[in-house]
Amino acid sequence: MSNGAKLIPQKRGLQLDRVVLLGRTFDEYCRYFLLEPEELAGKTVLDVAGGVSSFCAEANTRGIRVTSFDTIYSLTPEEIVERCDPDLDSVYHAIGQVPTYRWDYYKSPEHMRELRKRASTIFLSDYKAHPQHYISGELPRLPFENSSFDLTLVSYFLFAYQDYLSYEFHHASILEIMRVTQGEGRIYPTVTFEAQPSKYLPLLRSDPALQNFDFAEIKTDFEFLLNSNSFLRVRHKA
């Protein structure tokens, strides 16, 4: 555990000292973002901060054209494993003692760990086989042309880490996400690891520089982190 993220226990929720690498599956993404796979066929999708999730790999096998973007894609597969395995171990050993989670979809910390490991294993195989699907970079800059994607997804980044990411970073990131997106952006979850609504949500809605966008919280049936049963949908106003 010494090489993983440091856990900071003084608050109620899971507290991390940095963004961790945890893999999430195609099914989890569909639940987070209310995605219907048949409706995405043939569309272009960007997965921002995709990390070691298997969404990109699994989606492309279904005919959904997904590109994943993350800072870690400048690393070799071996270097990524050296980061993601200790991160998963750290979270696994702590999360069962944290009161801000519901154990419905994941039956236990062991089950959660199994799914996370499965996702990262699928990712690593695809990362080696199809490196063109994985683009390295760092928000708030995206190396894509305007309106390149029909849909952009952000999973467990931005609002969840508001203690480490400023409002200015969120503002600039949303502007950039919508620059490269001709359809809509979806950000999940809208709460912090304390299971509290992000303080940035009302600021974004009232920000004069973001008045060309329509913001809506869309309810989902999925809730692992307490109160994480919605995503933020961002659309261009007509």
Annotate each predicted stretch with a short phrase.
Residues 167-183:
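A short glycine-rich, Lys/Arg-flanked "PGG" loop and its adjoining helix->strand segment in the class I
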